[in-house]
Amino acid sequence: IDGRALEQGKRFILHFGACDYKTEVWVNGEWAGTHVGGHSSFSFEITDLLRDGENVLVVRAEDDSKNLEQPRGKQFWKQESASIFYTRTTGIWQTVWLEPVESQFIRQVWMTPDVDQKMIGMEILLDQKTEARLKVEITYKGTRMVCDTVTVLNGKAVREWKLDQNLNLEWEHKSYEWTPEHPALFDVHYKLECEGAAVDEADSYFAMRKVSVENGTFLLNNRPYYQKMLLDQGYWRGSL
């Protein structure tokens, strides 16, 4: 760790994509946190546990094969695999990374598309319950759809935008809707400002997609969509 980053007030978030099943984390001998669940992502702020130069990270992962109430998919609870069950596994199985952030940053954004109303709704959550301004720009195939500034109060904001002002022809031909054959995506750029200074920026994307069921028929964007529902499954002798 570069000591200058610590001196400049940077905060450091340690992210785990997933670790099976119960995870305990220590940094430089100090406990950082515990997470239970083998498929969900999690993170810990470890700023106060870091020191300039080399740091030691210890991760302990436990998967109790005797606990039959624990979600495990098809992992076998016995020592050796048998029948259709998978080999027992434990530990980190998704990416782990360290993220430097400012004292205030965008923690999470929930995006909810409304195909029928041609709208996108967003719920924005900052790391701290403070007041800030968030600039949001939405583009589609390079065309700007939304350019707005949201006032964030108490660390949270909720906003909806209409998306059809500049895409009348596109909306008529449904080319904006996401399907497996035409995976159309809208790009989003966020810029967070506190006291007039930019403190965080992030890029994301979303799709205009609606999934529903009517009279027993699966619908994608209000139209019947046939699903093959195939399972392609294999076993590798060296592991499974």
Where are these regions (language model features)?
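Secreted/periplasmic carbohydrate-active enzymes, especially glycoside hydrolases
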Residues: 1-240
